[in-house]
Amino acid sequence: MVREKVRISTRTLQWKCVESRADSKRLYYGRFILSPLMKGQADTIGIAMRRALLGEIEGTCITRAKSKKIPHEFSTITGIQESIHEILMNLKEIVLRSNLYGTHDASICVKGPGCVTAQDIILPPSVEIIDNTQHIASLREPIDLHIGLEIERNRGYCMKPPKNFQDGSYSIDAVFMPVRNANHSVHSYGNGNEKQEILFLEIWTNGSLTPKEALHEASRNLIDLFIPFLHAEEENFHLEKNQHKITLPLFAFHDRLAKLRKNQKEIALKSIFIDQLELAPKIYNCLKRSNIHTLWDLLKNSQEDLMKIEHFRIEDVKHIFGILKIEKHFTINLPKNKF
């Protein structure tokens, strides 16, 4: 049987923007690459990034309109070309950029005739309109239009209850999604066991964020989601004394990792799962039951630790050492002592 050799790439991951353009004030496009990645990693990152880009990034929207002169949403006002429903839909499309939190007030106060556009909205100082030309309404007669607005910052899609309030305010379904679309694709290169991958990310935004800003924010949000796992408390296992236990030298694998460059190789070791080591089924199952899933998990255990695993024998430890004798591919100094 030919054993597949597992190699670790010590090359630092790098990303860059390979294409960037603004098709309009409300449509930005960016294309990015990340490489080199091990087989399977590009899809893992690409799927997570796409979900984070579309669902985890916050946006600012108009969520409510208020006017005492409006009897109901589907009514019309003399002198205004659009129905109230059409005006609400136009307000829904207004693209805003801000760092505010909570609910803030804005307003429209215009005298006709003329066109009402986004530039006629009176906003808080911290809010910016991306496209001042966005149409809201057309006033055909010399009438006064006064609309109170509420602005919120949130994420995802927020469907307001259909109920209208007695004060003449109307809720607006808000799409707090600065990223219009995101796609990823994978390019493989290399031969045989040396295959690596390049991740391509395409991002379209509504102009309130650039694709690069969206990529940074999505990355930070993903990191924040995983940080709790890094601070999880280790469980303390109290093992009963066993008179038949074999006493082994207190050699800890992690003592041999002192020469590694932690920022690169530690991450690489955590990316190699014990599934790739072609272990015997019994050994594999024992390790998995002991929450040893990666090469990094394995190397943190001493020989004595491994012998404490239920149903584990000295021959099993030797078998693991036999597999890890491909040490030159891990650049790790393994023990030379015999059992």
From Swiss-Prot:
Looking up InterPro entries in the UniProt record yields:
DNA-dir_RNA_pol_insert (IPR011262), DNA-dir_RNA_pol_RpoA/D/Rpb3 (IPR011263), DNA-dir_RpoA (IPR011773), RBP11-like (IPR036603), RNAP_asu_C (IPR011260), RNApol_insert_sf (IPR036643)
- Positions of region (Alpha C-terminal domain (alpha-CTD)): 267-339
Q: Report if keyword Transferase is assigned.
A: yes
Q: Where is this region: Alpha N-terminal domain (alpha-NTD)?
A: 1-233
Q: Which residues form a coiled coil?
A: none
* Xref: Gene3D superfamilies: 5' to 3' exonuclease, C-terminal subdomain, DNA-directed RNA polymerase, insert domain, RNA polymerase, RBP11-like subunit
**Record comment regarding domains:** The N-terminal domain is essential for RNAP assembly and basal transcription, whereas the C-terminal domain is involved in interaction with transcriptional regulators and with upstream promoter elements.
What name appears for this protein in its UniProt entry?
A: DNA-directed RNA polymerase subunit alpha
Please give the organism: Populus trichocarpa
Query: What are the top taxonomic ranks of the organism?
Result: Eukaryota, Viridiplantae, Streptophyta, Embryophyta, Tracheophyta
Gene name of the encoded protein? rpoA
